[in-house]
Design a protein with these regions (language model features):
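Single conserved hydrophobic/aromatic residue that forms the stacking wall/gate
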Residues: 1-16
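Interaction-mediating elements
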Residues: 19-145
Length: 145
């Protein structure tokens, strides 16, 4: 016997969850102005492969992926949240001076490949596989390799 698929609350919830996490390709000109300026200032010679707007419940963020594999993530205001330069180094112009000084003093041969920031801290991944965590006053609070 044929049974029609259920349209219970579970199905409605599943559809809403899928809709709640939505990635949409956008043009670079649709990024917040501060994100556009950041790209021009620090990644001006890089070619954008894709820019995406991510909507997750009530929050919004933006991803920019370059043809060289570098990736930027911005919050809804266009402030950078993550800079990931797998095959090169994060431009020193975007690394906070105290973090840059700590890295150059303690790991002079290492490059910063990735830096993330949020409301609590900065996380830095180096080319020598060390991972450093700084609080918002740039005090080293954790180290891992």
């Amino acid at each position: 016997r044929d049974v029609a698929p259920s349209r219970g609350l579970g199905d409605v919830y599943k559809r809403q969850v899928v809709k709640a996490n939505d990635d949409k390709p956008i043009k670079v000109t649709q990024l917040p102005q501060s994100a556009q300026q950041f790209i021009k200032s620090h990644f001006g010679n890089s070619k954008v492969a894709i820019a995406k707007m991510e909507t997750d419940w009530l929050d919004k963020s933006y991803d920019v992926i370059f043809t060289d594999g570098n990736k930027l993530e911005f919050d809804k205001q266009g402030n950078w949240k993550e800079i990931n330069c797998k095959y090169s180094a994060v431009p020193t112009s975007v690394i906070p001076a105290p973090i840059l000084k700590y890295v150059s003093d303690n790991y002079p041969d290492a490059k910063v490949l990735k830096i993330e920031r949020d409301k609590r801290d900065y996380e830095v991944k180096l080319s020598n596989r060390w991972e450093l965590k700084f609080d918002l006053q740039f005090n080293l609070i954790d180290i891992d390799n």
